[in-house]
Amino acid sequence: MDYQKLENSLIDVIKEEQAKLGYRKEEIRLYYPLGSLNHFFDTNGNEEEMTELLKGFAVYTKERLGEVRYGNRGERFCFFIPPEGSEYVHIHTPEKEFIKELVALVGKHGCTMEDIRALFLHTEKKIHREAIANGEFDELIYFEDDTEDTYNYCFKDEGCHIIYHRFLPEDYADFEF
């Protein structure tokens, strides 16, 4: 079983968390819906089938993230990453400068959508940008040809600040915005 997409996602989420909150060598719990896990493995399994599929994940990630444990309640799966995993991500993965810059930018008072657009354009990568009128978000931006950052970034201007969420393209499509 190829667990690389799931491991990459866990690492990306931990990096984003560390950009927002700072690094601490501590256990982290990350939650994924069954649908997202099915996207990682290109499957359409139920909870029991996913539990079976994940049996080799701890062995696969042990050298990098430590003894990752997982459990589920219905279609909601929780991954327990030990302190060693948090430390590994902090020390051994390349810096995701873009996510750090984005987190810092949206954390500033007075951040605007123009500031967000400028940050994306500053990367000199080809981006896709579109207005969204779904009540949840105002704008969608993603990198068109970036194989490492494949997320869809969704932004909402709440008047006094900008919030964002990032989704894997398959998860974004599931929302049917």
Specify the residue positions occupied by each region the protein language model found:
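Short glycine-rich, basic-tinged beta-strand/loop micro-motifs
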Residues: 23-44, 96-106
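Charge-enriched amphipathic alpha-helical scaffolds
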Residues: 38-67
